[in-house]
């Protein structure tokens, strides 16, 4: 019997008391699964690991499912706290774990369809060059001003999210639903964020607000302190505006490469060889561009660059390390990245800080300017394992889990004290459990229960 069939038949029952409190997000209109006994979901010999995992699944995963309302006409996933809406990157970490649970297929399809419904609405009222953007977030209360705000996107990992769900639950209907809109979203990204056609993507915002442009990536990352928005370098027209960032971000470029790799995988899974070939061409060009222009041997990582001059921005930030997960570095580059991550620049008591500790702007509790976030830690650890650095990955993952056990599950943390910062049980902090389930940890072991053979 396969694991999912086993789960469907054995995890029905009263919700465990260890993950106290109601599942706050569920409401009328959500396709409610059978009650899940979270105690029976996990296989671990450590009761503290079980308690942590149960709390994460209740509060960060199941607790973020929300009923249709306002601008969101289908089941959606809220981020948590005061972040009321369906974001791009937050949501992908949640659906990844949601797909492990039985009878969640339709809810997950609805979550993705919210993005594609937005694409249709957006395209009806925007010029052709702006078509197929997916906004950073869709807010249920924003039914009248959504065309003006948010007029920017976010880290492009929707395709990665679909791949993760498909690998976990085999939902080909979801893949068929998403392939077309995903490719169009990626083409928007290349068209409107790689405006010099060099294979590197910048940030931007149709609002013309510089901070909105920064919101497309790690909100206050130090590499974007000098960001300016300009008009399109080649397209002319009386309605053109200063919407295009002049810094190509190492993080967002790597994320788009990662998304393209996921799209190749999904296309091949459905037999669409031409789609896979189109995406592979994008990957090859972008990987070459990152290696040629963004790699810095001294820093031991990838740096953002000026869009027009390709001069590197001299600071390494959290986005510098996403290239590992995206498969960008050569073997030699990855070795140098592992060396750099072992230095005091990045080995804070709780790693990995969001900017080089030697940078004068670093502050251990500053938002994307020295603090620590579970989701990037998960992605860095995943990338390290990809290149064979399991011990370093486990060190990062184990310290992240241990800190959550001590200080609670939270949005982000102080890199020195480990103090919890921001929103408790933010949805994407579910990646603390993902680290264990993906086998990235050494000390803290967690698996889903398997049927005895």
Identify what each model region corresponds to:
Residues 5-28:
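N-terminal export signals
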Residues 159, 166, 257, 263-264, ...:
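Heptad-repeat amphipathic alpha-helical coiled-coil interaction surface used
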Residues 88-122, 319-329, 377-390:
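Alpha-helical support elements that line or immediately flank enzyme active sites
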Residues 45-56, 103-117, 171-190, 270-291, ...:
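Extended, well-ordered alpha-helical scaffold segments
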Residues 36-86, 110-148, 198-248, 288-372, ...:
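Extended glycan-interaction surfaces of carbohydrate-active proteins
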Residues 1, 22-44:
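C-terminal segment of N-terminal export signals and the immediately downstream linker at the start
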């Amino acid at each position: 019997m396969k694991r999912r069939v086993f789960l469907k038949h054995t995890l029905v029952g009263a919700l465990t008391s260890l993950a106290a409190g109601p599942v706050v997000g569920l409401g009328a209109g959500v396709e409610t699964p059978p009650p899940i006994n979270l105690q029976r979901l996990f296989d671990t010999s450590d009761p503290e690991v079980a308690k942590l995992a149960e709390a994460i699944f209740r509060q960060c995963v199941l607790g973020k499912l929300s009923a249709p309302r306002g601008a969101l006409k289908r089941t959606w996933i809220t981020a948590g706290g005061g972040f009321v809406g369906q974001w791009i990157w937050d949501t992908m970490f949640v659906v990844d774990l949601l797909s492990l649970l039985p009878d969640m297929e339709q809810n997950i399809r609805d979550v993705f369809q919210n993005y594609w419904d937005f694409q249709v609405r957006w395209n009806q009222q925007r010029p052709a060059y702006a078509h197929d953007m997916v906004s950073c977030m869709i807010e249920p209360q924003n039914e009248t001003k959504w065309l003006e705000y948010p007029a920017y996107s976010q880290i492009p990992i929707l395709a990665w999210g679909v791949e993760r769900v498909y690998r976990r639950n085999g939902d080909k209907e979801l893949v068929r639903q998403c392939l077309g809109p995903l490719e169009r979203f990626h083409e928007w990204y290349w068209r409107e964020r790689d405006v010099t056609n060099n294979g590197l993507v910048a940030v931007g915002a149709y609002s013309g607000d510089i901070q909105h442009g920064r919101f497309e990536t790690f909100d206050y990352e130090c590499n974007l302190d000098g960001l300016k928005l300009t008009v399109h370098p080649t397209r002319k027209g009386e309605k053109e505006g200063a919407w295009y960032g002049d810094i190509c971000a190492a993080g967002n470029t790597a994320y788009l490469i990662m998304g393209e790799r996921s799209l190749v995988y999904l296309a091949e899974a459905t037999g669409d060889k031409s789609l896979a070939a189109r995406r592979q061409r994008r990957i090859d060009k972008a990987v070459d561009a990152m290696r040629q222009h963004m790699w810095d041997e001294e820093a031991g990582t990838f740096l953002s660059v000026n869009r027009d001059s390709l001069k590197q921005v001299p600071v390494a930030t959290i986005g510098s390390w996403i290239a590992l997960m995206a498969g960008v570095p050569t073997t030699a580059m990855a070795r140098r990245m592992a060396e750099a991550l072992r230095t005091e620049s990045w080995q804070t008591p709780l790693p990995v800080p969001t900017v080089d500790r030697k940078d004068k702007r670093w502050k251990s509790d500053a938002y994307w300017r020295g603090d620590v976030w579970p989701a990037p830690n998960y992605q860095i650890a995943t990338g390290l394992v990809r290149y064979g650095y399991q011990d370093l990955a486990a060190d990062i993952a184990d310290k992240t889990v241990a800190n959550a056990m001590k200080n609670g599950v939270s949005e982000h943390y102080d890199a020195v004290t480990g103090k919890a910062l921001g929103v408790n049980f933010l949805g994407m902090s579910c990646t603390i459990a993902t680290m264990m389930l993906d086998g990235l940890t050494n000390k803290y072991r967690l698996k889903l229960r398997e049927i005895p053979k």
